Amino acid sequence: MSFELDIGHTSQAGRNEVNEDFAALVQGQGRDRERGAIAAIADGVSTGGKGREAAQTTVNTLVNDYFATPDTWDTTVALDRILSAHNGWLASMNRRRQPAVGLTTLTAVVLRGQSYTLAHVGDTRAYLLRGGRLQLLTTDHVMAQRDLAHQLTRAMGLDDHVVVDYSQGELHSGDLLVLLSDGVHGSLPERELRQLLLQPQDANTPSAVGAQALSEEITRAALRRGSTDNVTALVVRVQGALEATLQDESRRAQHLPVLPLLKVGEPVDGLVVTALVADSGVHRIYQVRDPATQRLYALKTLVPARAHDAQERATLAHEAWVARRMQSGHAAVSYTHLRAHETSLH
């Protein structure tokens, strides 16, 4: 299935003279296509008019530099390296320019392979709509006291070191990801947001509203609700997913159960064990047979005692990922049909 996105972006100053929100999305092209896409939204906070600059430079730096990081880096590592460096630069600029200070929130999501990776600082938000259920993916970094409800506890450029919230999850075709500034989510109840996202295009068209139309309607609804801040919405509908990446496989391997010690004749995900070939104390290799074709295969597993070893799980996933990509008459070929029935780690 090809990786296709329907993208919508609307940003307005609202009742303010200056719009200090900024958002962008970049999708990999050519050799970078396998890197997926990155979307980000930022809400600048300033004294002296530097909020817009902070928001714009933070988003542009992240979405452009992401594709320059090594492909072998985990997505969270790539994002953290970029954000740490940019935060240090922004904090240094703020010290030199005081009292004119520019801070910004940031919520960014990378859509890669069959997963998403989220990075978050401040009170911009990310939502995921899947199967009719709207889920908030971020936590607002604001003071708990009622009279200081809008005072940020974390922001890009506030200190030399920034603590970024990272999270990852599976990406499904049909998912709708929505990034919002606080000018939107502070006025628009989640119940109403969900209703907007679920609305059909019209009575005669069962297909969903396009992402651009959704982003426009979300910001209009926030203004109708009395928002006095800038309003920005970035909407991304996933219309297809890429092939699983090594990162996807490694994350998946951490959750699959490890097989018990198997005996000859026992079934394993549609195969039948015919012999124990090797036992290293860490791994076991079994000979297994496909009853449908009578073909024999080798099946490698972790011993139960190493079930909690995250590194061994990741290594086994790495070996399987490499094997599926090797096309050689001199190397073992992965039995890809088994993946459709895989319920355990092997």
Q: What are these language model-derived features?
A:
Residues 1-298, 304-318, 325-327, 339, ...:
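PP2C/PPM-type serine/threonine phosphatase catalytic domain
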Residues 327-335:
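Conserved HxN/HPN-centered segment at the entrance to the catalytic loop
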